[in-house]
Regions:
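Conserved, structured core segments of small domains
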Residues: 1-103
Length: 103
């Protein structure tokens, strides 16, 4: 699953000159892959796109930055939304797991 992570730190906790942006995460955690990293450095914000197999692995990945920044984690996808069923009955049946009877 893909996640957009926004890490925000205060200027006094800035990693510039102290390991840099990569010091705020652990890229060696199994089950996690850093897809992309961007910074709005003068705002002290780092944006990550991370693929993680589970939330525990994602938390371990972000652990190095836990005491110096906050992290907003949002699940994201590159898949389009499914087409919405046109019939309310089809929606209700799908929600309840009922077969519509058509093959």
């Amino acid at each position: 699953m893909l996640f957009h992570v926004e890490q925000v730190h205060k200027p006094e906790h800035c990693p510039y000159g102290h390991g840099g942006s990569t010091s705020l995460h652990d890229a060696t955690v199994a089950g996690v892959r850093l897809v992309a990293m961007y910074g709005s450095f003068m705002e002290h914000v780092i944006y990550l796109i991370v693929e993680a197999s589970d939330v525990n692995s994602l938390n371990l990945f972000l652990l190095p930055g836990m005491k110096t920044c906050t992290a907003k984690i949002t699940p994201v996808s590159d898949h389009p939304l499914p087409i919405q069923p046109s019939s309310p009955v089809a929606v209700e049946g799908a929600r309840l797991g009922i077969d519509s009877g058509s093959d």
